[in-house]
């Protein structure tokens, strides 16, 4: 690992000569405050801390090796250059515990930030990955010269804590071989805490779960060019309070589950197919998106409750490929107590009617128009997940289980009720 404090006088002089404006938000230099700048690249092989009173710059791909713990203080700002990214290997840990008033922010080091400016953040654990020998799978999205094999048999594996964290302008998928998206969790175990995380303006997939048993809570995905919340290869965790907003970027889906015909779950090779349990999810699409708001395919299973699927100009729900359709017919893949409010709510396949399946009265789902979503309109770029007075989604929910993870008091459909305090104070929505 290379850690080198930069000379602030040189940095500030260069910024001034370049005529760059807005440096307070881009370079972590607050008005009246000069923070030391620390450049980081390569391997971290021992316990290391990144401090809030400095600006950390990822000049290359940073790898936390097995046995080491990377601690990031609340309020720390991490800037990434084009080749920058962070990988936490199996047996390593990250303790990134921000707070509502002092979130940890990973963002672009560019003066004019844009989606895809840098690679992203990867947690690689030792929990099972479906269809892989021994539950282990080499990662296929790493830059040249960097290797990692994720997965294993430790379902309760602990990769650390990722709490009150924003990841912005990541997911580079051009010019460089392989992109992890914004935030990728591969083979991450249930001992890992992922709570209050925003992934914003991503060039590829925003949040990607590959295998593992990790559970996630208070997740906000805003603006992305591929899939918002993606799972495959045997993810069997839980999730609650998940908001996915395509915004003004032309993406594909809000949720994509399964890997299509390449999915190990499709041919019976895998012994632990994807089977998440989700409550309180809001998916907000856009008029010109490429796919349905929810695309369920491959051999995925899963149970989803209290979902608000809204405003896609294409469709709300598509269940593709025979194995996923078979799982749906057998009750292994299910959506209940949910609302679909899109221009066209269902994609019916030749041998499977998503509309008949979803609107079976036993499922207690509702088929509404896009104008009946109960969500306020976007104003000045702000993103609202709270429900308007009288919204259909304020009734008809089923209580989540009281199991120590879920909040059973969330008696509304979607990620938020009439107010949305859990996504306020630590989130941000910069265009550049």
Model-derived segments and their meaning:
Residues 1-12:
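Bacterial N-terminal signal peptides that target proteins for export
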Residues 19-22:
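C-terminal motif of bacterial Sec signal peptides marking the signal peptidase cleavage site
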Residues 27-71, 83-93, 97-99, 103-204, ...:
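Extracellular beta-rich repeat passengers
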Residues 77-79:
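Post-signal peptide N-terminal segment of secreted/secretory-pathway proteins
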